[in-house]
Curated annotation (Swiss-Prot):
Gene: smpB
Intracellular or extracellular location(s): Cytoplasm
Gene Ontology molecular function: any one: RNA binding
Region Disordered, residue ranges: 124-150
GO biological process: trans-translation
Predominant cellular place of this UniProt entry's protein: cytoplasm
Protein's UniProt name: SsrA-binding protein
Length: 150
């Protein structure tokens, strides 16, 4: 079940490969995610010392969050991947033009997982072409349905 999607990533990048990673979360973050108070549009993934971290994802704390902790909505969260997957991704990210972006948050067997994508940035004309194709697909669907009036 999907919790949050990053639609902006599909508009700004060509997604070449996808990986599923676990996330190290605190208790208040899990409760807030279950309540749907998460936004990953501004998030990105970095590699530090052969470990991966999700930066910029915003998890808004609930009002009922504990009083003895100070919740940080945009803290850096560690991503959990297998060592060989991390090595493979490090090699590909070091190539020019590749980056790692979070695509969505979802549940797998009751655990919150983050799907990350190996992505290459789109140029402005690529974005315009994507928009034209999307509009044409909508228009085709409308024509096939018989809803065009001239």
């Amino acid at each position: 079940m999907t919790i949050a999607d990053n639609k902006k990533a599909f508009f700004d990048y060509f997604i070449e490969e996808r990986y599923e990673a676990g996330i190290v979360l605190e208790g208040w973050e899990v409760k807030a995610i279950r309540a749907g108070r998460v936004q990953i549009k501004e998030g990105y993934v970095v590699v530090r010392d052969a470990e991966m971290f999700l930066i910029g994802a915003h998890i808004s704390p609930l009002q009922s969050a504990s009083t003895h902790i100070n919740p940080d909505p945009v803290r850096t969260r560690k991503l959990l991947l297998k060592a060989d997957e991390i090595k493979k991704l490090i090699g590909k990210v070091e190539q020019r033009g590749y980056t790692l972006v979070p695509l969505n948050l979802h549940y797998t067997r009751g655990r919150v997982k983050c799907e990350i994508g190996l992505a290459k940035g789109k140029k402005q004309f690529d974005k315009r072409e994507t928009e034209k194709n999307r509009d044409w697909d909508r228009e085709k669907a409308r024509i096939m349905k018989g809803g065009v009036k001239e």
